[in-house]
Amino acid sequence: MNSLSRSEQILATLLLDKFDQLFETVNEIPDELINCCLQMEGSNSPVQILLHCCGMMRRWSSTVNLGIAVPRDRDAEFSAKMDKPGALALASETRTAFAADISRTKMQQAPAVLPPGREAEYWMSTCEGVLLHVYEELCQHLGHLEITRDFLCRPAQ
């Protein structure tokens, strides 16, 4: 991250800190609840939320910003089941790759690949804008995960 400007370094740190919060939240959830969903349609398990964030991060940081395709099955992210050690290992690998992507990103340049249907998004004009979108998504999904954790881990009544 040495070639990044101070404000770009701040963005990189915010992104990694937010992902670390997701990681730690999943780590705190008891193993037996890690693949549980809330009793409502469209609910996702903690593992599904974490895996979705991993796929989302690399899609934008590598496939879009750098033009280096990272295979992703978005639908599978929302039906995934995995034990906690496996999910956290995958998340750790994703974090390392994501940080490497950021360090290679020329923040003020246009992304290498514009996803179909997203070309008109105002934040797609620079790689930094794309990473701000990733930050927005991580914040949203951290909130989703925290609500899921709070309901799954609440004391029985």
PLM regions: where:
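Acidic/histidine-rich alpha-helical segments that form the ligand environment
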Residues: S79-P115, E128-C139
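Basic/polar N-terminal segments that are highly enriched at the extreme N-terminus
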Residues: M1-S5
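Short, contiguous alpha-helical
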Residues: E8, A12-L16, D20-V26, D31-A76, ...
